[in-house]
């Protein structure tokens, strides 16, 4: 398999997207950063190209993804968006179709923790835990993964679920990876820094170990 060099990063100016952008550039990837507001990206780097595009439009997604070795998406319509549930699912279906239309095979998605199991048969999003105002967005990511992405056979996708609590912190490089069960520490907390999450995602980009499946991270 040829090494991934050129990537498209959707949602590159957001909380997770900006961490992914920094990690990818620091590791020498050529990045096309796809954003709604290009002025939000202040980085200057010879390997960075910033493109304004509406990822809810199929042809715009396909055009911007053409020629890439892989597409990474950190798209989020905004936690305060009243239509976050519908928009998340609708736009991600468009992104997947655009990636296919562009002829790109590898797709890595910033997932949510909601679809992780916290006990046998019980997913976080069905447990009543977590802030209620975030539930529509959490459920949208979880249901997109369970109802759509898991059935996707045409492209080599990955859905990378963070720990339940992901915050700005430091890049330690010391974390654990898992599959469908939430990873918790010795006192039962599920947490990760966004910097370590980004490092693990770019590791997966550079050294693929997961194919058409979800994986997760935690300390």
Where do the PLM segments sit?
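Short, polar loop motifs at secondary-structure junctions
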Residues: 34-40, 163-164
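Conserved beta-loop-beta element that borders a ligand/cofactor-binding pocket
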Residues: 146-168
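N-terminal Rossmann NAD(P)H-binding glycine-rich loop of SDR-like oxidoreductase domains
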Residues: 7-27
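NAD(P)H-binding glycine-rich loop region in Rossmannoid oxidoreductase-like domains
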Residues: 39-94, 98-101, 205, 209
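Glycine/proline-rich active-site loop of Rossmann-fold NAD(P)-dependent oxidoreductases
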Residues: 153-154, 167-174, 204-213
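Substrate-positioning beta->alpha
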Residues: 140, 188-202, 213
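Conserved catalytic-site region of short-chain dehydrogenase/reductase
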Residues: 80, 114-119, 165-169
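Conserved Rossmann-fold NAD(P)-dependent oxidoreductase catalytic core, especially the SDR/UDP-sugar
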Residues: 30-32, 38, 93-136, 150-151, ...
